[in-house]
Amino acid sequence: MFKEFLPFDTVRDDALKLAHKMYSEDGFVPDVIYCSLRGGAYMANVISEYYKIAHRSHHPVLFAAVVARSYTDVRKSTSRVYVDGWTYPPANLRPGDRIMLVDDIFDTGKTINALVDILLDYGMNREDIKVVVHDYKEDSRREKLSVIPDYYCRKIVVNTPEEDRWIHYMSHELVGLSADELEKHYFSKDSELKRILKPLFGENENKNG
């Protein structure tokens, strides 16, 4: 496995292009955009802004969030998905509401599948739920789940450990960085960040990524 550093503006630009496809080409307008916190927040905000402008003469698209977690750190995955809450409870959804569920990555797929199952339990139709991610990992070594992304910016096909990657989203992630990675991707671009971040990471950070 290798680590990829994905710039925030790449995610932003890709999200705008994907929003244009969904709206202008496919005619999909959600009633509710749910961002899966934390990872989906940046991309969901960009998509929401697109709809605010493109769909401004029609009913507003509600922006909401759900707090769900299955990852504990960069190398460990919990055995289950925890859903801490929704800012717009699924109980408030009406039959026929169109829902967009946004996350940064579909990796194991456990989080997305758990959230879609909850929405289905509240009577939503699967065809009215669109799963949107920046990165869709299709890993042949894993069991295929019932829910996969409807829209994605990149599809990453993984058949071997060497083909796998850990994607570091520079829009919102700091945990798990080595001293060398901090220097290359942060301090070299803005020297003041060294003064701010180095004390937080300490002197004992691993020098190698």
Predicted stretch roles:
Residues 1-29:
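Active-site-facing substrate-recognition patch
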Residues 25-29, 91-95, 124-125:
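Glycine-rich phosphate-binding loop signature in dinucleotide/nucleotide-binding domains
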Residues 27-37:
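Short glycine-rich phosphate-binding loop at a beta-alpha junction
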Residues 33, 65, 101, 131-133:
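Structural beta-sheet core signal
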Residues 52-58, 122-125:
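Short helix-capping segments at alpha-helix termini
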Residues 56-99, 107-117:
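Short, glycine/charge-rich flexible loops or terminal/linker lids adjacent to PRPP-binding catalytic cores
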Residues 117-209:
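PRPP-dependent phosphoribosyltransferase catalytic core
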